[in-house]
Structure formats: structure tokens, C-alpha cells
């Protein structure tokens, strides 16, 4: 039986997670993309603790976005996650694309976070 897109994404994510780990000095910027929304978290894997989070469902973004599943929404989430991380003193992160291809919404979020001041 042929693997579904979801299964292929999960396989890629397992391979990525074997190599990518967030520390206290350089936490992991994890991205989850659903059909209608996009979510980003900055995670310290040593303490298993989420330091900062942002998504298209966030109160700060919910009113100004027409849709949560497009590139402009991803750019807004990238800017918001970078702003919140910088407020907590986090400047360097490791990018975890969550098994998604580095293209489209995931790339837009990463580019926006870089432009807003995160280093990865």
C-alpha cells in the first residue's frame, strides 16, 4: 500500500528529530502546519519545556488575518514568534521544519523570523 502524505511527513519528521535537538543555549523552533493554521514553538528539549509559542489562532493575530492557512499568515506568525523570543532573551535557535518541505508557508515563517531578528 502506498504511503499517504501524512505518513511521509511523519517519516521525515522522525529523521529530522534524530539530528535536531534544542538546548537551553540554542532552543528548537518547531513548526507544525495544518491545513487551516500554522503553529510555532520555541522549545528547550533538555528541560522539555516550551519557552515561547505563537500561532494563527493567537489573540494578537486572530482579528487581523483573513485566513490562517496562507503565506501572509505564516509571515505574521514568524514575526510574532521572533518578537516574543527576543523579549525572553532568545536570539539563536535551531529550526525544526516538522517534516514539512522547506517551501511555501514553512519557508515564509522561517524568513519572517530571520528578518525579525532570530538567528538560525
Swiss-Prot record:
GO terms for cellular component: cytosolic large ribosomal subunit. One of its GO terms (biological process) is translation. InterPro entries: Ribosomal_uL18_bac-type, Ribosomal_uL18_bac/euk. One of its GO terms (molecular function) is structural constituent of ribosome. Keywords: Ribonucleoprotein, Ribosomal protein, RNA-binding, rRNA-binding. Belongs to the universal ribosomal protein uL18 family. This is one of the proteins that bind and probably mediate the attachment of the 5S RNA into the large ribosomal subunit, where it forms part of the central protuberance. PANTHER family: 39S RIBOSOMAL PROTEIN L18, MITOCHONDRIAL, LARGE RIBOSOMAL SUBUNIT PROTEIN UL18M. Part of the 50S ribosomal subunit; part of the 5S rRNA/L5/L18/L25 subcomplex. Contacts the 5S and 23S rRNAs. This is Large ribosomal subunit protein uL18. It comes from Picosynechococcus sp. (strain ATCC 27264 / PCC 7002 / PR-6). The gene is rplR.
Amino acid at each position: 500500500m502506498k504511503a499517504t502524505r501524512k505518513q511521509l511527513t511523519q517519516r521525515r519528521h522522525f529523521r529530522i528529530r534524530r539530528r535536531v535537538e534544542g538546548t537551553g543555549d540554542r532552543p528548537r523552533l518547531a513548526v507544525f502546519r495544518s491545513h487551516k493554521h500554522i503553529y510555532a514553538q520555541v522549545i528547550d528539549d533538555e528541560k522539555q519545556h516550551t519557552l515561547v509559542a505563537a500561532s494563527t489562532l493567537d489573540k494578537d493575530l486572530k482579528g487581523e488575518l483573513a485566513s490562517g492557512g496562507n503565506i501572509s499568515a505564516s509571515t505574521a506568525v514568524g514575526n510574532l514568534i521572533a518578537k516574543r523570543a527576543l523579549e525572553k532573551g532568545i536570539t539563536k535557535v535551531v529550526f525544526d521544519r516538522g517534516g514539512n518541505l522547506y517551501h511555501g508557508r514553512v519557508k515564509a515563517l522561517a524568513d519572517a523570523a530571520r528578518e525579525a531578528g532570530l538567528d538560525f
